[in-house]
Amino acid sequence: MEQPRKAVVVTGFGPFGEHTVNASWIAVQELEKLGLGDSVDLHVYEIPVEYQTVQRLIPALWEKHSPQLVVHVGVSGMATTVTLEKCGHNKGYKGLDNCRFCPGSQCCVEDGPESIDSIIDMDAVCKRVTTLGLDVSVTISQDAGRYLCDFTYYTSLYQGRGRSAFVHVPPLGKPYNADQLGRALRAIIEEMLGVLEQAEGDISCCRQL
């Protein structure tokens, strides 16, 4: 019997500040060219750097696609590696977006938990990707930055009950090019799907015992 195709949503961000070309969206476009194989329906979206758009768009993407996994990709001017973020944070959003706006409450979800962890074991994903011998270094972080990246991640984790991931990439050429970032994203997402399936298989086995 043929396995049903999995829906995977991957987002990058549009321009903001000094990032007139956002490496995250370039990397996602490279991923789209490569694809994730015949068993995955890949849906990519560019997200404006706007709090209110994120609050509207992220729930809509979850509702539209019912995805197995949503992966958000953002650029960090401080990053020199491709970084897997473990969690999103609810409070502390003071930076103005492209519309010169920030939430009056400075939080994502009123009365939401302080932080939400991804259900994906990022340490396991990092170890698996590292063994593949890519020409890209992959590391782990627990602080996505309290700006639109963190805001988007928390919103998605809240909406998807933890079935989200966030990947920070460096600016283009510092040190990786678009092709390297696209291939790294593909490897990371494939490993995330593997870790997710393994975890769900373990849960299923426990229920049958």
Swiss-Prot record:
InterPro entries: Peptidase_C15 (IPR000816), Peptidase_C15-like (IPR016125), Peptidase_C15-like_sf (IPR036440), PGPEP1_Cys_AS (IPR033694), PGPEP1_Glu_AS (IPR033693)
Xref: CDD domains: Peptidase_C15
GO process annotations (BP): protein catabolic process; proteolysis
Compartmental location: Cytoplasm
Keywords assigned by UniProt, alphabetized: Cytoplasm, Hydrolase, Protease, Thiol protease
Origin: domain of life: Eukaryota
Reaction(s) the record says it catalyses: Release of an N-terminal pyroglutamyl group from a polypeptide, the second amino acid generally not being Pro
Record-annotated active site: 85, 149, 168
Entry-linked PROSITE patterns: PYRASE_CYS, PYRASE_GLU
GO CC aspect terms: cytosol
Single annotated GO MF: pyroglutamyl-peptidase activity
EC assignment: 3.4.19.3
Function: Removes 5-oxoproline from various penultimate amino acid residues except L-proline.
Subunit details: Monomer.
Family membership noted in the UniProt record: Belongs to the peptidase C15 family.
Name the record gives this protein: Pyroglutamyl-peptidase 1
